[in-house]
Amino acid sequence: MTPEATRVFLRSMFDAAVGAAMPAQCVAQNLPEKPKGRTIVVGTGKASAAMAQALEMAWNGPLEGLIVTRYGHAVPCKHIEIVEAAHPVPDDAGTKGARRMLDMMAGLTRDDLVIALISGGGSALLSLPAEGISVEDKRAVNRALLKSGAPISEMNCVRKHLSAIKGGRLAAAAYPARVVSLVISDVPGDDLAAVGSGPTVADPTTFAQARAIIAKYKINAPPSVIRHLDAGVDETPKPGDARLANIETKLIASPQKSLEAAAAIARKAGITPIILGDSIEGEAREVGFVMAGIALQVRRFSQPLPAPCVIISGGETTVTVNGSGAGGRNVEFLMALALKLNGAENIAALAADTDGVDGAREVAGAFITPDTLPRARGLGIDPWASLANNDGHGFFEKLGDQIITRPTLTNVNDFRAVFIS
């Protein structure tokens, strides 16, 4: 396979993974029965506006509602209002949207239906601090968590316990109305309580756990946050809470389904796929080093399977940012992978975020090929220094190997494919 054909093949798998999670493909077939009363649509996340549009197209009856999505992710809707807000660090637009959404839950009855459209990114987008915590104090904690290297599960535990709307609080506010949540998962293991910090799902975590996470990562949290966590007042709704008895949650798209769609593309091309898992976590560079070892084992010893094959994985790695670069877990993974492969022939890879945004940059990810390191050094770039500086985006931008998709309007986490030809 030529270098260009290799890139086309890898990109076709990524496109299939994204396509399998598009709201137009998965919302209509999961709609609830119409209620006797009102239908209120609420939602948050990078895919939520596209989910709302798909819902409007399939719903035969009156509805109203409010969606909070990321800047650049809005799509036209006729009956559901779309509000854009900041991600990954919350802004005032998200706070105002969250307050309005919570207010919409007041006065609902058993005859009413709330359809909640939840996808990744909602943890930052739907930001309504608990009483006594300012928006800026919550932002400060969020920024520190993003740089700490904490996995998404731990970040969301803290976020829920600093929030007036997350961790099942939105659903509790809708009681006694029926709440049906349609969820596009972006979290390892499809923990529905973790997607968007679970505004409509019971929360098993506690204030004590949130406080321990702050201590574990040495987060210099503002005094208001420490006081709130130490007080532990008004715990999030737990499994068995009567206010959540009329809740139904449906997983309509997931990382695993997207990985399987990519694997089907490989089989069609006559290349054997192996899915390592949809919930791989850890430091992005360490995952890159490990993945390189697996690829080299295939190349040298045909283990765990012979070439041609493609190693596919998903999940959400982390980057502990120590340098001045922008981070980005997929580009950091690829730099580490390339360095460990050290130009090994017949191995190429793609890693990208299915939402089109890797870290804080409007770039989905990048490619590497056997000539990645020689080309970089020919441009005067020190790859090891780029990795140490967490500057994967700068590295691949100079090489012209970035993958730029614009917002995909869905989000099922990272996609990685290592092709041994």
Tell what function each PLM region has:
Residues 1-42, 50-51:
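An N-terminal, well-structured beta->alpha segment
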Residues 54-63, 79-81, 102, 106, ...:
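A glycine- and small-aliphatic-rich helix-loop capping segment at beta-alpha/alpha-beta transitions
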Residues 68-110, 158-159:
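Glycine-rich oxoanion-binding loops at beta->alpha junctions
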Residues 106-194, 199-202, 380, 384, ...:
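Glycine-rich, mobile lid/loop segments that gate access to catalytic sites or pores
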Residues 133-150, 203-218, 323-349:
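Gly/Ser/Thr-rich active-site loops/lids in small-molecule metabolic enzymes
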Residues 177-180, 202-290, 294:
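Accessory alpha-helical/coil subdomains and C-terminal extensions
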Residues 270-351, 359:
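Active-site segments that bind and position negatively charged phosphate/pyrophosphate groups
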Residues 334-421:
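Internal helix-turn-beta structural module
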